[in-house]
Amino acid sequence: MDFKKTILWAVFSLSGLMLYNNWQVHEGKPSMFGGAPATTASAPNKSGAPAKLDTPVAISGIPSVTQTPTANSAPVESTQKFVLENELLSVEISAAGANVVDAKLLKELTADQKPVEIFQHTPTHTYVARSGLVAVGNTDLPNHTSLFKLDRSGKDGSGRPFLVLSSERNGVKLEKTFLLNPGSYDIYVGHRVTQVTPNGAPLILYTEIVRDGSEEKKIGPFGGAFSASTFTGPAIYTDGGKYKKVSFADIEKNKFTAPSQIAAGQPGWVAMVQHYFASAWIPDDKLPRDIYSGKIDNDLYRVGMQTQLGTIATGTTVMANAQLFVGPQEERMLETIAPGLELLKDYGYLTILAKPIFWLLEHIHNIVGNWGWSIILLTVLIKLAFFPLSAASYKSMARMKEVQPRLAAMKEQYKGEPQKLNQAMMEMYRKEKINPLGGCLPVVIQIPVFISLYWVLLSSVEMRGAPWILWIHDLSVPDPYYILPVVMAVSMFVQTKLNPTPPDPVQAKVMMYMPIVFSIMFFFFPAGLVLYWVTNNLLSIAQQWQINRLFGKKPAK
């Protein structure tokens, strides 16, 4: 029995299983090793009208309220929209509710060369950012269904575009100021609340993101079963609870328990995440806040924060400012906006390894200016770092290859006597000073690095639209001509030929067909990831061939 080969096959199988399980968890689905399966999201509203938009459940002792349209309310689809734009971002704000109902990323283009849209409010897709007021015993306050009028707009003294919208109901006036900084995906949203007439009820400002449960279409056959999956859904951050993703399935089942009240002075934010991009409300931390989430309608969900404004004296005003981020998950940029916001770029469980790997990849790119060559150079550096371990593994394989004829003879000699065969093999390993498991440890140690690099390449928006050479115009999508996956399959086949042939015929066939199985999967993986794998395989082949030469054995044919 070839112990080393068996262990290696078990390690690679377990690694593949764990990697697939990580995809499932990252996508918001339960782990294969525990928990009930996720329920299928309900079908979206397809009646042709946008889904209903109700006010949120108030927290901190304030009962739930259900908003009914009033004389000061208007359907979103029939209202005027106002546009703010800088060189990176174009947003539309509706007069109904003063909600952000459309956001285009002008520098991030789709396959048909149109700007990527984050926020949208159409009959088939709902994804908006909204805010408003609630209070005990008074549901008729300015909220996300109220009709807002334009007070003023233009550019401030620094040339920044802005607009001010206001609405007054039941003695409370809410003014919303939207302002865009140049070269920024960050929208300043100021809420100016004025108590016009006496009203003793404490006021609460809510800022929330509403989205349907639709996800990105997977590429490939069988519903994209072999394509790389990423998480789509809400995420929250508090100074105490740190970063947490919330699946739509958990909201559907009421499994998510929001953190307790965030004290004044402590950071916190809520976000909606998708592959490469995100939106986030970041309220001012000067006032206490509460995080909430919930299901609004059929396949329509929300996550938000409620800021406690307290009781406002008649004739006085309270300001509650917030930032609304809408843009790509560029780690360095996110770090400058709010504490913990860089966690929107999710590296999975091995963040502690993935972060320095991306740091190194980024610095290589700053030198060579091409992400494809950066991946290749990073792979070379990682290979050099693990050279001593890899060399030990390949030396062990080479020694095993030398004794293959003797192993075959033993198998024939002790046919039908497995116990004696194992004893004879162990005695031979002892005399030849061969550790049959010597090639396993180096492989096991390198697995976390491979998984970390996988998440770096999968989650980095910098790869989106980044070309390499010739036919590779975008490292974030599969190779359009499948050249890299074919090269990868060939390189894996060559590697199996360089390794000692397992004495077990079944095991030998498994090793022979493994490149084909892996290739089917990698046909639909991002080209950047396949490029890493191909480079790693070619370097491994060169290293193993050289070690085989040093041991005086030519690769098997």
From Swiss-Prot:
Annotated GO CC locations: plasma membrane
Superkingdom in the source lineage: Bacteria
GO molecular function annotations of the record: membrane insertase activity
GO biological process: protein insertion into membrane; protein transport
Classification via PANTHER family: CYTOCHROME C OXIDASE ASSEMBLY PROTEIN COX18, MITOCHONDRIAL, OXA1
UniProt keywords, alphabetically: Cell inner membrane, Cell membrane, Chaperone, Membrane, Protein transport, Transmembrane, Transmembrane helix, Transport
Subcellular location(s) of the protein: Cell inner membrane
Family: Belongs to the OXA1/ALB3/YidC family. Type 1 subfamily.
The protein's assembly and partners: Interacts with the Sec translocase complex via SecD. Specifically interacts with transmembrane segments of nascent integral membrane proteins during membrane integration.
UniProt cross-references to Gene3D superfamilies, sorted A to Z: 2.70.98.90
Membrane topology, record value: Multi-pass membrane protein
Protein name per UniProt: Membrane protein insertase YidC
Transmembrane spans: 6-26, 219-239, 367-387, 437-457, 514-534
NCBIfam families associated with the record: PRK01318.1-3 (NF002352), PRK01318.1-4 (NF002353), yidC_nterm (TIGR03593), yidC_oxa1_cterm (TIGR03592)
Task performed by this protein: Required for the insertion and/or proper folding and/or complex formation of integral membrane proteins into the membrane. Involved in integration of membrane proteins that insert both dependently and independently of the Sec translocase complex, as well as at least some lipoproteins. Aids folding of multispanning membrane proteins.
